[in-house]
Amino acid sequence: MADPQHWLITGASSGIGRLAAERLQQRGHRLTVICRSQERAEQTLGWLSGDSRVLLADLADLDQVEAIDQALLEKDEALDGLLLNAGLQYAGHRQVRWSAQGLELTIAVNHLAHQRLAMDLLPLLLRSAAPRLVITASEVHNPASGGGRVGRPAGLGDLSGLENHSAMVNGEQRFDADKA
């Protein structure tokens, strides 16, 4: 077995995040898991082992993300890996949901919170001999899931855009490299 590593994981209370966390633990690694609620934290503590720990922060509130980042930076423990897995999807909902900062909730949680974690904790990650940054998404790619049924599926269409490959935005057919 390799030397134990320290991993920070979001979205480890269920799904592929939990599976990844369980596998990392089986290999003897120490985990710091961010959970969004006390209920999720207690559930997660039920299966975490060793000196792994749970921190509370709702990724929908970037102030809470910053507080977690600052606490980890003050603790000054190197991280060998960041596994950024938490995500949500409100497919089919007519009402837009907003983060604490007034951002659309999916963007705030799935992207901005993880960007903030990665950028703020980069100094701890770079202290590792072999740092790893892993970002996952578990539903949106799957057209059979709720998240994957949003919008029209990707495709090439009728390829009519190739007929006017040099058309400018204003519709002119002439191509002028100086204006491109």
PLM feature spans:
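Rossmann-fold NAD(P)H-dependent dehydrogenase/reductase core
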Residues: 2-180
